[in-house]
Amino acid sequence: MTRVSVVGCGNMGGAFVKGLGQHDEYDVTAIDPDETARESVADNALRTTADPAAAVDPIVVLAVKPDLVDPVLEGLDLTADQTLVTLAAGVSRSFVSARTDATVVRVMPNLAAEFGEMAAAATHEGLSEEVRTLLEAMGTVAEVDESLMDVATAVNGSGPAFVFYLIDAVKTAGIEGGLDPTQAERLAAQTFRGAAATVLRDDRTVDELVDAVCSPNGTTIEGMEVLWESDADRAVADAVGAAERRSREI
């Protein structure tokens, strides 16, 4: 059994605890000073505590906001035989490494870790097979150079919010057309899920898949013409760019 301490049980840390908690091979200690945060993951961790000194496991996940990294690290007495997985956006591996004796790997995950559908980017440096296996228990991991972590933060870290926004737009259009809100949400969300699965499993390019759905003079091509003539792709690119810039600023 692999023992893991998760320091910080907010949105991202909580998703990690819940994701790992679904696997019997992980013994998880959830650490957070906030009682409500601890209670939110109590059913998924073998133990919860407010004491950072409890972070004695071989793998420690640091899941706190960027401005809390420094003070939290001061309270963690990690050793050279531990690995620290830092999830803080915009905080460099070197910044963290200078403040701990543990081996450091920088990871940008997303909230889908809770459901085993996470897309994560991890730095080459510090990424052991044990940590890779841990991440893969919650989804997919791409190993990247740290210079690419800011754009990865925008694509897979912030990306779920962009997709949620698009799902809601499709859902709203369905409701305006007469669908029941629950039906519209289910159909929209499952359509995005199915489209993503197709992209991952089909050998065709995204453009080829679009063509496969667009029959001449059909309904899809009519809708695609509207998207092609709009600035939708530019708006998405701008959103990713803005998130990347913010990651560099933090």
Predicted regions and their residues:
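NAD(P)-dependent Rossmann-like dehydrogenase/reductase catalytic/cofactor-binding core
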Residues: 16, 189-250
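NAD(P)+-binding Rossmann beta1-loop-alpha1 motif at the extreme N-terminus of oxidoreductases
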Residues: 1-50, 59, 99, 117
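A short glycine-threonine-serine/GTX helix/turn-capping micro-motif
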Residues: 153-161, 210
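Residues at the starts of beta-strands that form the adenosine-phosphate
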Residues: 3, 26-27, 83, 103, ...
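Rossmann-fold NAD(P) dinucleotide-binding segment
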Residues: 47-102
